[in-house]
């Protein structure tokens, strides 16, 4: 059986009526390192001219398989030590040196008697401890015999635990599948939301192209109406020109008939004059007709050239309009594509900034948490170091007390 010695300080200034709870607290202080500060300071008493510490040693406290029973035995021993302490205080030990050798011898004899009585009580406590250990062993053996009927229960418990484990695994698998499906749905939703701006941009581009087509159709209709009006005006001019030419021909023909009805003279001179006048009139008429025809041809040529130039101008205007509309459409399409690209880049930049901020926040939280843990670990390390130093100091103090106790016992045995 392993044993341990428990030391209880006995203050010299305490009265003989000290309650038992004070000594129990001192025993608990010997078990708890945090309460060792409450131990009273050791004082000195003079016995046979020697300076020694007035400590009372409370014998052997059994430890090991008894557990809580050992604690009870120790408390009983502590109660006996308090009685012994009261007898020691009433035995005549003083804080001042004895005036004579007889008083010293009497004090030593009283101390020897108290120690003999104390050793007897220690042997009695050891017997009580052995009896309690035997009872505890019997109790454990009876408990072990009753535990043999637990085989069926263990089998049922094992099957239940296996079923619970399988159910937990199935639940985890289902939760994993659910999370995967949810992640896929979130991915599709995110893709749909990302494609929405591009869809809107394409719809806007299509609407703008429809507007351009409508404008081109309206301009085409305007040009066609202008061409029709120009054709009508050209036809009207050509008809008016033909009517003017016909009227001129009629006027010329009427004047010739009137001039032919003039009476002709009978003389040669008159005949020659008449022929000359007739031929002059014919020449003038031919000249006028040729001039009119030439003028008509020139006007027709000018009209044809003007019509050709107008047609060429209209065709050039059509080609230029078509090219301009194509350029406008291409520029609008390029502008819309650049706008869509700009919006996509802005969204990408915003997402990158957002994720960067989130990552920085997470890293800051991790750093702060690690710093807090580091501070806590440093504080715990400092506390453990202080507790270790405190325990080492009390260990040294207890070793010195045990050494003084052994020296005292050796001197008592040798005496």
Swiss-Prot record:
Domain annotation IF rod: ranges: 104-415
Main location: membrane
GO molecular function terms noted in the UniProt entry: structural constituent of eye lens
Residues modified to N-acetylserine: 2
Keyword tags: Acetylation, Cell membrane, Coiled coil, Cytoplasm, Cytoskeleton, Eye lens protein, Intermediate filament, Membrane, Phosphoprotein, Repeat
Coiled coil regions in record: 115-144, 199-248, 295-395
Protein task: Required for the correct formation of lens intermediate filaments as part of a complex composed of BFSP1, BFSP2 and CRYAA. Plays a role in maintenance of retinal lens optical clarity.
Protein name (database record): Phakinin
Lineage: Eukaryota, Metazoa, Chordata, Craniata, Vertebrata
Gene: BFSP2
